[in-house]
Design a protein with these regions (language model features):
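Ligand-binding loop in jelly-roll beta-barrel domains
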Residues: 86-110
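Short acidic-glycine-tyrosine-enriched beta hairpin
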Residues: 71-86
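A short, N-terminal "cap"/entry segment at the start of jelly-roll beta-barrel domains
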Residues: 1-33, 37, 116-123
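A cytosolic small-molecule/anion-sensing beta-strand core signal
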Residues: 61-62, 77-78, 96
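Short strand-coil-strand connectors
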Residues: 32, 68-72, 95
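Short histidine-centered beta-strand/loop micro-motifs
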Residues: 27-28, 39-40, 47-52, 93
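Short, conserved beta-strand element in jelly-roll/cupin
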Residues: 41-42, 52-67
Length: 123
């Protein structure tokens, strides 16, 4: 059972922003079993094809991302959610400036230890 001593109360303005490349920034809040990441993508940003053991749920707050999954293109716009199962290869393009709130279960170890080189490319 969780106690108040275990709870985290965080203002987004206090979350460190990391610049991954000229078109993508990221902010993360991590719990014991889940990760919440706000990803800010400028129009034209590309998240290369990748997969991971984590289940991913991107919730687009503003803008639009075009995902390529299983040979299909899916456009997810502000106010929409996409559920991406574990180990499913996917990539995405920002069709406009976009704010994406990603939920991962479990937390992305490659993001935490900064071995996510597929995102740290220069364009």
């Amino acid at each position: 059972m969780s106690t108040p001593a275990n709870a985290k109360h965080i203002a987004w303005k206090n979350v460190e922003r990391e610049k991954l490349n000229p078109l993508i920034d990221r902010e993360m809040v991590v719990g014991a079993k889940i990760m919440l990441a706000r990803v800010l993508l400028k129009k034209g940003a590309h998240v290369p094809l990748h997969h991971h053991h984590n289940e991913q749920v991107p919730y687009i707050l503003e803008g639009a991302l075009k995902f390529a999954i299983e040979g299909k293109e899916i456009v997810v716009r502000g106010g929409e959610v996409l559920c991406i199962p574990s180990m499913m290869p996917h990539e995405a393009w920002a069709l406009e400036d976009t704010v994406d709130l990603d939920v991962f279960d479990p937390p992305r170890e490659d993001w935490l230890n900064k071995t996510d080189n597929y995102l740290r490319h220069e364009r």
